[in-house]
A protein has these predicted regions:
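Pre-P-loop entry segment of helicase/translocase ATPase cores
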Residues: 1-29
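Conserved P-loop
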Residues: 28-99
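Inter-Walker segment of RecA-like/P-loop motor cores
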Residues: 71-143
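Walker B catalytic acidic pair
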Residues: 148-149
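ASCE P-loop NTPase helicase motor core
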Residues: 152-272
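ATPase catalytic-site recognition across NTP-hydrolyzing enzymes
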Residues: 259-260, 266-353
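Gly/Thr-rich phosphate-binding beta-strand-loop-beta motif of the actin/hexokinase/Hsp70
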Residues: 342-370
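Nucleic-acid-processing active sites and adjacent nucleic-acid-binding tracks
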Residues: 347, 365-398
Length: 398
């Protein structure tokens, strides 16, 4: 008998690497994945769904580098990924507002403010925290940590936020999600200021033999679930009892193996080639832009001699308060930002600009105030866009 699609059985398409991540679903997932490989919408969204279903009432935290990135990219991508899995706003979850009272009753801890909090129907919560505004998550304890674009996190900031992932062992200590990590990023390049390679050290956490055993167990569990679903469709009571009993046994084995297990994965954008299409890669290669080997192919880079100057730059050379978060909070997630978010922009003063021409055309803009000079914004275009589109972006932003 062939398994038929129904209300309880649906067909989903994911790439092979996402399938491995789904079949193993380990306590820790560290994914260094090429650009446009569906890091958030597939890999992270599937882990979110599993964590929600297995940890009702648990508080989790999602961390990103800046509040601006959180507002514009991260939360919209999370929402898109959950929609892909069939979960909708106001049905399975709400965000930025107080949930229904029956949802609140299932929360393990009390929350008094719901700004940047996603709440699910069973009391599971996500608090979204940016490293440039860590006060939002200060003083709280979390069961697990999710994060994207980890290459932009300084190691010491990750270490500090990791200390908050300690909570509620009495309730969740036996869960594979207790003190779990779900981290994704594309390959960091040490030649680029502000990118950090410490994530590569986490490969030491992975036991290859245990991952192989976990994958085999996940495949056996998937087959047991398929047979159970077939018995339900056949309306065979005896077959249902036997297949359900077998499925529960495999679920116990699978859950036990997931505890304390880490999957460290490095993959290129080619894992998503079926979705992106051949033209995507042809255009990227034809443009000849720097970073294809790192951003798309996930090939680690060594520090070149001419870039060692930039590594000497420290935090004192940068300012962290350039975005006016109060302006962001007035707009919906995913809002296309303009110059009103620039905290230090003086509309009465001239705006300096400098352009770097080439395949990638970029312009940076800044202003001087006394002895301080702040670079405030970069605008760029990639082929086939040219100077006209670059000028349009400037006009739209400023």
């Amino acid at each position: 008998m062939k398994l038929q699609e129904s209300e309880s059985v649906e067909r989903r398409y994911i790439n092979q690497y996402a399938m491995v991540a789904a079949l193993t679903m380990p306590q820790n997932f560290i994914g260094i994945l090429g650009r446009a490989s569906a890091k958030t919408t597939q890999f992270q969204a599937m882990r979110i769904q599993q964590a929600v279903e297995e940890c009702p009432g648990a508080p989790f935290v999602w961390v990103t580098d800046t509040y601006s990135n959180l507002h514009k990219n991260v939360i919209p991508s999370v929402l898109e990924g959950l929609r892909f899995l069939g979960w909708e706003m106001d049905r399975e979850f709400v965000i930025d507002r107080q949930p229904p009272i029956e949802w609140q009753r299932q929360m393990y801890n009390v929350i008094d403010k719901y700004k940047q909090v996603m709440t699910f129907w069973n009391g599971f919560t996500f608090t979204f925290v940016s490293l440039d505004r860590p006060s939002i998550g200060a003083g709280r304890s979390y069961v697990g940590l999710f994060g994207d674009e980890v290459k932009y996190w300084p190691e010491e900031k990750f270490t500090n936020i990791r200390k908050a992932v300690r909570g509620y062992r009495a309730r969740y200590g036996d869960s594979p999600w207790y003190r779990s990590l779900s981290l994704t990023s594309d390959m960091p390049n040490p030649n680029h200021t502000g990118e950090y390679t410490w994530m590569m050290k986490l490969v030491k956490l992975m036991n290859k033999e245990k991952i192989k055993l976990l994958l085999q167990t996940g495949q056996a569990l998937n087959e047991a679930r398929r047979r159970y679903a077939m018995s339900l469709q056949a309306d065979d009571e005896r077959a249902q009892q036997l297949s359900e009993r077998n499925m529960r046994r495999w679920e116990e084995r699978w859950t036990e193996l997931r505890r304390g297990t880490t999957l460290f994965m490095v993959a290129s954008t080619l894992i998503n080639a079926d979705v992106l299409g051949e033209e995507f890669f042809q255009e990227e290669i034809a443009a000849g832009l720097e970073g294809i080997d790192t951003n798309l192919l996930s090939i680690p880079q060594k520090l070149t001699a001419d870039q060692k100057f930039y590594v000497t730059m420290t935090a004192r050379d940068f300012y962290q308060d350039g975005t006016d978060n109060a302006v962001l909070e007035q707009h919906d997630y995913g809002w296309e930002q303009d110059c009103t978010v620039l905290r230090h922009l003086d509309l009465r003063m001239p705006l300096d600009g400098g352009m770097d021409d080439g395949n990638m055309k970029s312009m940076v803009f800044g202003q001087q105030r006394g002895r301080e000079y702040r670079v405030m914004k970069e605008i760029y275009t990639l082929p086939p866009e040219n100077e006209r589109q670059l000028a349009d972006k400037f006009l739209e932003y400023f």
